[in-house]
Amino acid sequence: MSFIPVAEDSDFPIQNLPYGVFSTQSNPKPRIGVAIGDQILDLSVIKHLFTGPALSKHQHVFDETTLNNFMGLGQAAWKEARASLQNLLSASQARLRDDKELRQRAFTSQASATMHLPATIGDYTDFYSSRQHATNVGIMFRGKENALLPNWLHLPVGYHGRASSIVVSGTPIRRPMGQMRPDNSKPPVYGACRLLDMELEMAFFVGPGNRFGEPIPISKAHEHIFGMVLMNDWSARDIQQWEYVPLGPFLGKSFGTTISPWVVPMDALMPFVVPNPKQDPKPLPYLCHSQPYTFDINLSVSLKGEGMSQAATICRSNFKHMYWTMLQQLTHHSVNGCNLRPGDLLASGTISGSDPESFGSMLELSWKGTKAIDVEQGQTRTFLLDGDEVIITGHCQGDGYRVGFGQCAGKVLPALSPA
């Protein structure tokens, strides 16, 4: 138990301690903090208290404006930092609890803070690792007989996304302009996206990277995974459908991707690990691992339109529905010698379960626009309207506590008028 009061339904008990980057009106410099209850512990203020063998010579990483250098230190430093923080925040430890002057400088209320991206994201890769999602999309566009493409059960399919347009929760998303072909009997047209979608995803940050030309074996992959965030991979379905053959997504995805600001460390998630999904056919040896690395993370998506008094839940899903694990994704990404770097972001792909209410995109929930999605208060949707706010939340439920991620939220702004 922490000396900082933590409500039972708080996302941020002492069992969590996620890392983020924040600033305040009184101190506009972005700095690294840890969430505890409704407070933020400023690590730049208490960096001198990290005196263990892994961090004593690297206290300066907590003076940085991003988490990249801390991520790059590796598991020994992460575990030491977590143990030190849990000790310092414990109700039984006087070092921070009883130092009123230090406490006053070290703690900031989350309500008064502005959150920033937790890392400088050099590269961003989006996978497509939910079997149910891939099957649903395949049925819609190719039919049941060809729902899964031949490679899907043999490797974690992915594509390189756009790192520059990843934004932190709360940043509005502008409806994109682009080229589309709504009528196949007519030439393509240019205009505002008409089929704007959200995608329920999660993503993990890479810790230490690998040398150029040297793959990461799957037995070591866990050493390179720092922690996880929620993600909304906004998608312009009409732009995407017209452009994606033969090279895959481009402008239909690159206009904006939202992530939650708090990075939940993998050690906080390990109590919620569950068995990996059965994979048939068995993957090639470089992708095989017996270590459980699938997690029971409850996820939900809510939508709040203009004129709605409260948000309506449109999806409830769970990260455990993923077919390919993060270890497999990271190993496959590096198997050709591709070098990953601290702060790189690797996303899960849309997370869908077998229950229609667990489908993680409006494309699936509306079944390609043929079914209305009830958002309560007399409103329905097939795709997103201007003014709609999408709010993703997620948590692991413990015994009397929860390890949560906060919110991943964004509001749709109208498209800019064509030039």
UniProtKB/Swiss-Prot annotation:
Mainly in liver and kidney. Ca(2+) binds at D126, E199, E201, D233. One of its GO terms (molecular function) is fumarylacetoacetase activity. It is an enzyme of class 3 (hydrolase). Pathway: Amino-acid degradation; L-phenylalanine degradation; acetoacetate and fumarate from L-phenylalanine: step 6/6. Mg(2+) binds at D233, K253, T257. GO terms for biological process: arginine catabolic process; L-phenylalanine catabolic process; lipid metabolic process; tyrosine catabolic process. Its EC number is 3.7.1.2. Keywords: Acetylation, Calcium, Hydrolase, Lipid metabolism, Magnesium, Metal-binding, Phenylalanine catabolism, Phosphoprotein, Tyrosine catabolism. Pfam families: FAA_hydrolase, FAA_hydrolase_N. Its cofactor is Ca(2+); Mg(2+). The modification N-acetylserine is found at S2. It comes from the Eukaryota. It catalyses: 4-fumarylacetoacetate + H2O = acetoacetate + fumarate + H(+). The active site is at H133. Substrate binds at Y128, R142, Q240, Y244, T350. Transmembrane segments: none annotated. The modification Phosphoserine is found at S84, S92, S309, S417. InterPro entries: Fumarylacetoacetase (IPR005959), Fumarylacetoacetase-like_C (IPR011234), Fumarylacetoacetase_C_sf (IPR036663), Fumarylacetoacetase_N (IPR015377), Fumarylacetoacetase_N_sf (IPR036462). Homodimer. NCBIfam families: fum_ac_acetase. Belongs to the FAH family. This is Fumarylacetoacetase. It comes from Mus musculus. The gene is Fah.
